[in-house]
């Protein structure tokens, strides 16, 4: 197990999913004093068919009962709305594509939840993330999870050293099928529950319908790089770079992909073919930097992920100033998207990263 410490009192974030359920069961089995917390972080339209918060809370309570631990239900809805959801809407309004799970981890799971747990006398918090942690010479290192298909270090890159010191990831050395098998062995009601793919804490729902409740939309043209109109979009915020599905462009030839957004003209630029040169970039600029180690990485050669589950891309790190980094890739990268996170690695060590602001292609045009 990935504790790298000897905590006596651990509070587990129980989400109602299989991963956190097995996390709690493993810690209890290994003799730790364990309690659970279910975080209720979304209250808007919680009575509709898409939001699973109520069912998730029932599942978390059932898991706690089977494992034999106490569980508290704690409401962080106001903090979520202020720290995560407001940013989410702001980024979509600006034409970018945010990743709320990254901010949710930094602001809610490893800040609000951590503060609550410490206030309750806990030494450590545990979550069901597929990531590992090692302590070397007193320094806590965030490492990739052993299961390459499930590694979630990408979503944890904004954790600070003090947060890592108080966190453990018991599933980091396991693969998903093993976690499912353990859940069945522990007779957990979540053993066969499907993984969530919705927005962090909000659940799975039709995205366009959801976003329209909070932001105004305006239809506009889909155009080629030459300026030819080939279709109509239903609002720039509903599209992301590299998107293929849902464009509704007829005719023959290769599939169409989103290549850029022009906010001044309210136009969506589309190109034909996955390998169109406008979909590839050699460099990016990122800011809003956050690093997992006490010292930020030096300029040099690393690998990077610009989206979850992509293969590591070798790159050169250059500081433009204290708050801004340029990454130059060894090979062109496909559909690098402003608003997403670029996360740096040194081997298996997650060093941190930042928010992509621009690339060497004009993909978000604002003037």
From Swiss-Prot:
Q: What class of enzyme is it?
A: transferase
Reaction catalyzed: S-sulfanyl-L-cysteinyl-[protein] + uridine(34) in tRNA + AH2 + ATP = 2-thiouridine(34) in tRNA + L-cysteinyl-[protein] + A + AMP + diphosphate + H(+)
Q: Name one GO biological process term.
A: tRNA wobble position uridine thiolation
Record's keyword annotation contains Acetylation: no
Residues where ATP binds = 13-20, 39, 128
Q: Which UniProt keywords apply?
A: ATP-binding, Cytoplasm, Disulfide bond, Nucleotide-binding, RNA-binding, Transferase, tRNA processing, tRNA-binding
Entries under InterPro entries matching the protein: MnmA-like, MnmA-like_C, MnmA-like_central, MnmA-like_central_sf, Rossmann-like_a/b/a_fold
S-S bonds:
104-200
Claim: tRNA-binding is one of the keywords in the record: yes
Q: Which EC number applies?
A: 2.8.1.13
- Give the annotated active site: 104, 200
Indicate the annotated site residue(s) for Interaction with tRNA: 129, 340
Instruction: Give one GO molecular function term.
Output: tRNA-uridine 2-sulfurtransferase activity
Cell compartment(s), UniProt: Cytoplasm
Q: Which domain of life is it from?
A: Bacteria
Q: Which family does it belong to?
A: Belongs to the MnmA/TRMU family.
| Role, per record | Catalyzes the 2-thiolation of uridine at the wobble position (U34) of tRNA, leading to the formation of s(2)U34.
Q: What is this protein called?
A: tRNA-specific 2-thiouridylase MnmA
